Amino acid sequence: MSKLLEIDNLSVCFNQAQRAVDSISLSLQKGETLALVGESGSGKSVTALSVLRLLNERHASYPTGKILYCGEDLLQAPEKRLRQVRGREISMIFQEPMTSLNPLHNIEKQICETLELHKGMRGPQARERCLELLRLVGIENPESRLGAYPHQLSGGQKQRVMIAMALANEPDLLIADEPTTALDVTVQKQVLELLQDLQQKLGMAILLITHDLTIVRRYASRVAVMEHGKLVEQAETSVLFASPSHPYTRKLLSAEPPDAPLAVAKSDKPLLDVNKLDVRFPTRKGLFGKVKEHFHAVKQVSFTLDRGQTLGIVGESGSGKTTIGHALLKLTASTGSIKLDGQELSGLDQSAFRPWRRRVQIVFQDPFGSLSPRMSIAEIVREGLEIHDSDNRDSHDTKVVAALKDVGLDPEARHRYPHEFSGGQRQRIAIARALVLQPDLIILDEPTSALDRTVQKQVIELLRDIQARYGLSYIFISHDLAVVRALSHQLLVLRQGTIVEYGDAGQIFRAPVQEYTQELLHAAFFYQPKDANLTTTI
């Protein structure tokens, strides 16, 4: 079978520094799925961007190599030819939908733009194709979403829009850079099965870039492993998982989340007691229009959390997980009762609530976006102390150093800035910022979703160690059920703002009662039997 894509001895340097991609060669045939795996910084995304010449060539050089698409070297192709290839013959699902979508254009305009450019579709024809694509990727009530802007969609919905745009012109090659990172397990399964169906219908080849080895095992036909810009191993999926030959590959395969946490004795009085929490958001007609109705995001949710325990909150995108976390911090208006150590917090105004903020901290999903690029690490970690502990400034530096040591970071690096750290290190900085105030409760909102498996495992072990040392309580919000299982003592399953199932995490993972919970667990790939014959080509 002829090769659709052949990368031959490709190297990429940035500003003549160390090679980001170092003499790699790989090929992809029509209808095949090749998974490109490796830790953050291994060169996976740089390789993908090189195929479509999307790197800034003032900073990136191509000293050697070829990228042959149907025998044509794209590295030598003129810009006019590249415009024909991009989006029509080769499409790409980018890793970060929050920054890949234009914030000034609505969803309809962004999808229709590629249809008009490559297929000449306009007006009702383009609109109908746009609706068809949104239905394909599982956007509910797509007619109401055509006029929405990116900021009005959840992370998972934005990712689905990106996938719809990539599939709009039925490309011969789809480059999928972490296509399911922001998606919950049921939508992950839907999207991957959609790609599988389209591949079978169109004979489309897929270059799948991911850090999720369970997805690789199930859907890729071949795997290429990258480390520090080099290709260290290539093999059929079943062969690589059964008998990896390179030490780095063995390290990746062994980086599974740890087992369930140790049991914690139940206390007489819960640290947190939430009763009938309710959140509604006003919806307006137009940018400056009047409020027409309210969207009911969280509906009469009740739960308790003991000191030293972790409550995992799971559910699909838009189920209300993050909204609950924001309501507990009074970042979102709510009704109902919220008690911390028996003190009613829901009726407090912002001024009265301020002393309680140091006792409830949050670690956000995106460590790069939540850390100020203009502040050093010491300034970031110290900021909370300057607000909540201004009378003891002499001890601030000591506390910053102690917090950085607690999360496994070198205090000598505290004068550096966020961009100088890896994704895993930035997440440790975010945890240190929360930890320095010695809180009772930390809300962890998707803290591991942007991290590869080896770094995920390190962060999980760090969180468990800190919890054991300080008796902290966590609310852990995630769509990754393997990580939730590793951390949670209790589990709360949400659907459309309503509790579906709530109780002991171990019991729910072993024997879920509700059908929706069963569907979630079935869709989570770690529940599938680890059999080499599971691999399904997409």
Model-derived regions, located:
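Conserved ABC ATPase signature
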Residues: 148-153, 157, 417-421, 425
